[in-house]
Design a protein with these regions (language model features):
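Secreted/periplasmic proteins that engage bacterial cell-wall peptidoglycan
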Residues: 1-93, 103-104
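Generic beta-strand structural signal
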Residues: 94-96, 118-119
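Intrinsically disordered, low-complexity, charged/polar segments
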Residues: 1-7, 111-133
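Short aromatic-glycine-enriched beta-strand elements
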Residues: 98-101
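Short, solvent-exposed aromatic-acidic interface loops
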Residues: 105-109
Length: 133
């Protein structure tokens, strides 16, 4: 399955990969690993922010001024004062130096998977599959 097919299939749906805690951002990430990347699941994590330290077979790029992000990369954000778990989303496009267009799911709102603008603020980096998408 391609990223475009994944988005079309899951847009507006509540993706609950593990059947626990409702539809969270990590559930969409795990479905993406299964359906698009076709890789073994990465290790369990306490929150989305921890995915970057347990990438499994995926490569890691830490955020910096020189970081180069590509469509299909898995972006990981750190915890905030209002979200101790962090966030994970799939990169659809780089909008500019400060924003991305992502495919994501919000575990707090429980409103299903959607395309959204997401700030680079708090970005830890990304996971990507060696060999492309």
């Amino acid at each position: 399955m391609t990223l475009t097919q994944f988005i079309k299939t899951n847009q507006g749906k509540k993706v609950d990969f593990d059947g626990k805690y409702g539809a969270q951002c990590v559930d969409l990430y795990r479905a993406y690993c299964r359906d698009v990347l076709d890789i073994q699941q990465t290790p369990s994590v306490a929150g989305a922010k921890d995915i970057i330290t347990k990438p499994g077979v995926l490569e890691v790029t830490r955020d910096s001024a020189l970081a180069d992000y590509s469509r299909g990369d898995v972006l990981v954000w750190d915890a905030t004062s209002s979200n101790k778990y962090g966030h994970v989303a799939i990169l659809v496009a780089v909008y500019n130096t400060k924003y991305f267009i992502v495919f994501e799911q919000d575990g707090f709102k429980q409103d299903g998977a959607k395309l959204a603008f997401r700030s680079r603020e708090g970005l830890l980096g990304c996971l990507w599959r060696n060999g492309g998408y």
